[in-house]
Amino acid sequence: MDKEQARKEIKRLTALVAYHNKLYYEEAQPEISDYEFDQLLEKLIALENQFPDLRLPNSPTQRVGGEPSKKFATVYHQYPMLSLSNTYSAEEVMQFVKRAHKQLPGATIEFFCELKFDGVAISLLYKEGKLDKVVTRGDGFKGDDITENAKQIPNIPQIIEHKDLPPAFEVRGEAFMSLADFEKLNRDRLAHGLEPLANPRNATAGTLKTLKSTGPKRWLDCYMYSLLSTDMDLPTHEVCIQWLEKWCFHVSPTYKKCRTLEEVMAYIEYWESAKNSLPVAIDGVVIKVNDTLQQNKLGLTAKSPRWAIAYKYKPENLATILESVDYQVGRTGVITPVAHLKPILLAGTIVKRATLHNAGEIQRLDLHLGDTVFIEKGGEIIPKITGTDVSKRSLDSEPVKFVTHCPACGTELVKRYEKALYYCPNTKGCPYQLQGLLKHFVHRKAMDIRSIGKQTIEMLINRGLVHTPADLYSLKYQDIRSLEGFKDLATRNVLSGIESSKQRPFERVLFALGIRHVGEVIADKITQYYTDIDTLSNATVEDLIAIPFIGTEIAHSVTNYFENPENLALIDVLKQAGLQLSRPQLATVFATQSLPLSGKTFVISGTFQNFEREELKELIKKKGGGILTNISAKLNYLIIGENPGPGKVAQAQALGISTINETEILQMLEL
């Protein structure tokens, strides 16, 4: 690979890893397995090591985790809360042990081995024996204050009474949800018409970040694994664990002190075969140098300690038979194929289904009915098919062909965008889409009508009582009372929930409409700039992409939604029902107002020494500025590099718009 190819690949991988980092740490909605993420990160690290001058300033290899959330107060860590370097290779564990001996010549080194629980790292701060704060890892230097939420976890002690307590100390651990409680939670969600959560880690992260301090925190548990204090003599990690146990913190009893590499490898091998017997998900083993002075000598990198490493188990991959494929219809009309498999025991659970994602995946795998397929469960509830054993394929086997018509309403499918995604275009008449839209509309993050679950929605649709979300607001007592199983109290609960939803703020209503690509965060961002539905409905694509973090795809999706007369009619009914379709002016005091480029708009023309144009656009957006594509009276600045478009320069001069160069925009960006 030459240097130009490396530059492009580093840029691509940096953006890709940052994207998946955000999904994992900030949104708790990962799209790929840990193993796939680690492989991407390893590729980026290898390229950056080969071409160190091409490493980007925002490289995820130089930072930990994700940004703290704006929803919670930020707390700076007294000691950096670094992540661990990890490996899937036994050889690299051996190299780690050899490096430790090389850097500590002649020393006797003990290694402390612990299981790596698949949860969320948290820090507990105690003062005078009382729990003062609980903070997430965040970016390693600062995290979110989740104290009130964490206090709901039963085995986090809020007061410790012991004569040997120091004035202040910090305990670190892993919050998690047991496999049994995770299954109970998902059964509960399904009973209320909610989508099941993907895995226990997602459930834990989402629960800890729920703004309400009440709720299902008692589903959570916590294992503690670290003690920090300037007021204590802590010569070894083993002593730290002993103090935690003495103070009645919840410590996993699965740790082991090892004196040789052979003992370390035996510990790894034992738990690889025994991990499915545990009540909680693990994804590997953590190996630490036990002695604190030796840890200090080995030191830290910017991202991780040199005295510890995480060995991660590869996802299990087993073979079974593909029996059939069916097709599910989502609320936006997306058709998702699901493979039905001959049941097999994988990672401690019986697996009968696997996701196939889209038509492209079926084609890539060259699937035939009756194939012997390899499945992998990398922490997700629905595993995926990773390959096919073609040598075992029957000569008369039938290839899997993606459906051409909607399985719910029979409408011919259409392919949209460049992705291998097929949609049912019958947005108003497809019963599965309506079910999905209504489930989304009543969700707690949208209109929060918790008294309406999946079964109620199905009955309302089957009775012809509801054809759009707006029809919920015209339901009468007798309409609901006539549904199977509904008595007076349940009926009144539904009506009360519908009435209460009229007070949900504008950003929640916008999210509830189910506009493609407009999630909870994007809805909030849009309504900070467009504070009522009428103004938003008249916004152009160019107007919308001027909003930080709003790209072309989202902007087109929003404008397309408001160009549809049926959607405008729906909004009129929601207005008449009394929903909040505007945001109070006070709410426009949003986070970007204190950023250096807040409220300013820019057009970029030409090439630049320090940036690609897309990089410059993202920097401007992150500093609060907006990006326009054309010169207009709305523009504040035209940024000109080498060989700018002469037409744009002339147009800017004619309108009296300021032109600035690369040095000036760097000053404005405060870089």
Swiss-Prot record:
In Swiss-Prot or TrEMBL terms, this protein is called DNA ligase
- All copies of domain BRCT, residue ranges: 592-671
State whether keyword NAD applies.
Answer: yes
Stored Pfam families = BRCT, DNA_ligase_aden, DNA_ligase_OB, DNA_ligase_ZBD, HHH_2, Nlig-Ia
GO cellular component term of the entry, any: cytosol
Question: What is its biological role?
Answer: DNA ligase that catalyzes the formation of phosphodiester linkages between 5'-phosphoryl and 3'-hydroxyl groups in double-stranded DNA using NAD as a coenzyme and as the energy source for the reaction. It is essential for DNA replication and repair of damaged DNA.
The record's Gene Ontology biological-process terms are: DNA repair; DNA replication
SMART domains (alphabetical): BRCT, LIGANc
Kindly give the SUPFAM superfamilies that the UniProt entry links to this protein: BRCT domain (SSF52113), DNA ligase/mRNA capping enzyme, catalytic domain (SSF56091), Nucleic acid-binding proteins (SSF50249), RuvA domain 2-like (SSF47781)
| Taxonomy, superkingdom | Bacteria
Q: Which reactions does this protein catalyse?
A: NAD(+) + (deoxyribonucleotide)n-3'-hydroxyl + 5'-phospho-(deoxyribonucleotide)m = (deoxyribonucleotide)n+m + AMP + beta-nicotinamide D-nucleotide
EC class name? ligase
Tell me which UniProt keywords the record has, alphabetically: DNA damage, DNA repair, DNA replication, Ligase, Magnesium, Manganese, Metal-binding, NAD, Zinc
Query: Which positions in this protein are listed as binding Zn(2+)?
Result: 406, 409, 424, 430
Give the EC number.
6.5.1.2
Which residues make up the binding site for NAD(+)? 34-38, 83-84, 114, 137, 174, 288, 312
Q: Which PROSITE patterns is this protein grouped with?
A: BRCT, DNA_LIGASE_N1, DNA_LIGASE_N2
- Which InterPro entries would you find in this protein's record? BRCT_dom, BRCT_dom_sf, DisA/LigA_HHH, DNA_ligase, DNA_ligase_AS, DNA_ligase_CS, DNAligase_adenylation, DNAligase_N
* Cofactor (UniProt): Mg(2+); Mn(2+)
Q: Which family does it belong to?
A: Belongs to the NAD-dependent DNA ligase family. LigA subfamily.
List the catalytic residues.
Answer: 116
